[in-house]
């Protein structure tokens, strides 16, 4: 049966806590069933953590929400069990073009090299993303999804948080060891705790028009500065599934947000871009302003903030939803270890410090893009236009031209969870401690596969690079003790092309194109330790069990 995800609704059910409050707190309650709350709840449930997901509505998001989902987000969705659905429905793209007036200034490719399983970006309406995530969540038994459940009270205690949850059947109390607030930019959780975000609001207005049409434009991101069809402003064009195109028109601060949403104002703007004879339908129209801001602290006792309620950015660069999903990715494994008693609660402080750093990076990039796109003085405008004119011929100017630095994952190089490289161990690659693991083509069990899915499962992973001089069986004996750690480490052995074999209890992958060794700057004996969120936390030129144990303790605040 075909599902209309744009109008998807979920059934409200009376919560058992109405009649008999749980005898002990739930391990985790999550407030907000957008992409961030859904991703966090799925991640926890896949690891066996009993979780309650609360949302004050019974629908998915509609209208002009997020549409650009980055490669790293897609890799996280793969781990959550719904990446393929996103790719199949979404519009994949790697290439963008920047124009000044009628002239092409430059073209960029966000994924110029081969050997990656996912594209740089897909465009996919947020209601599809939420729908696919919700359907995945409903498959997981440890997860309860409670719709039309509005949190109206929060009380923190020494060992739990008590929420007052308002439903069509009245109000009931819900206790949880930890609460994740993922209820968006207008967060009720933030207000209930008397907290706020701080930052900068930009004095400009933008019109978003989601237009249904058949158009000859390629599947690329096109951005115009001062185009002839919309003088002295900017325009962004993106393709979405179902023959829908997202068009963003800069309007200026003095534009009337109510009047500009009217069809008689929107249609002429769209026709100026497409041509007077163009046939199209307006699917959604909105006018927005935006801010770059964040909370001072993402953790407040047993309440942890993630996504838009913790930080907000302008839409230039697609850093909002993508950074929120990365919040979920960072938080879930830490919550699991803490509620299971395998790590102290101080591990959750590293969620705050790492993701506050990432938020600052996103806000900086978003602010710079906005300042370039919307110059606030004649001098700034002259600088911008001169930069764009130079960018046609000069590579250095292209690095300065900024139509939105598109989302990339944060490299947590200063994280306290990282183990510094051993003195004398020299690496020449991007896989430094704190970096997210990069993908590469491999073969597993005599079939084509990818590296990243071999690191799924919610555990730490040790990647050992085996040479031709000693077989995987010898390597496996060296790694045998890892499974006996207090937190077991899953061993993964990478062998050169043509050396594939089977070792009981160990995943052996064949580096068929040599890309794994190249991207990790690996030699025989090189060993990498990955966190459950696939970030590198340590690496060595030679495996040493005691060093791995120490790094594991450091990465879980057990040192």
Give short role names for the model-derived ranges.
Residues 1-31, 46-47, 100-103, 131, ...:
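Helical substrate-recognition/capping region of FAD-dependent monooxygenase/halogenase enzymes
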Residues 10, 241-243, 257-323, 343, ...:
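FAD/FMN-dependent oxidoreductases across multiple families
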